[in-house]
Amino acid sequence: MAYCLQTLKGISLDCESSMGGIKAVYLANFEDVKGVTLDTAGEKITGFTMSEGVKFKEYQFRKNTGSMNSTLTADETTGLNYVTTEVSLIFTKMETAKRIEMTALAQAQLAVIVLDSNGIYWYTTKDEYAAASAGAGETGTAKGDRNAYSLTLTSENNTYPFEVDAAVIATITE
């Protein structure tokens, strides 16, 4: 019987603080990302090749309203193994400019970089693009309720999101 052997290295206890949530998201059309460069170990992104003149756009939102969740799907019987990543965002105050952007995002095939609350950048779309899988516009009922658009971007890739070297971000975003 053949076995799928992997080199295991272990994970030691990390005693540093680990903050939940995300701070920002950077989006581009997936087709405009022509390639990524990995470090020598093949585990961290150290560069992007973009279409001429194209950069990732920054999407900002209020604190504690965005998240990134990656879920492994594995089936030993079929040999299936992939990771679904969902990036959920809330943009407060419904208005025309945001409605237009939400409509564009709902129809786009996207490349996604997420900045988490620990200051680490993650590229969620190394193998396949992300697309809108859910969204809403809501006014709320009471004065204190949220008035906002929400959007979930979903991608399916061969592995969990790749970390992006922070030095690269300034060269590929605007």
PLM feature spans:
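Generic structural motif
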Residues: 11, 16-18, 30-33, 64, ...
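Solvent-exposed edge beta-strands and adjacent loop segments
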Residues: 13-84, 129-143
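Mixed-charge, glycine-accented linear interaction segment located at domain edges/termini
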Residues: 128-174
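Generic detector of bulky aromatic hydrophobic side chains
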Residues: 15, 108-109, 149
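Well-ordered beta-strand positions in beta-sheet-rich domains
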Residues: 58, 121-123, 150
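N-terminal alpha-helical "arm" segments
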Residues: 1-23, 170-174
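Structured, beta-strand-rich domain cores
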Residues: 63-127
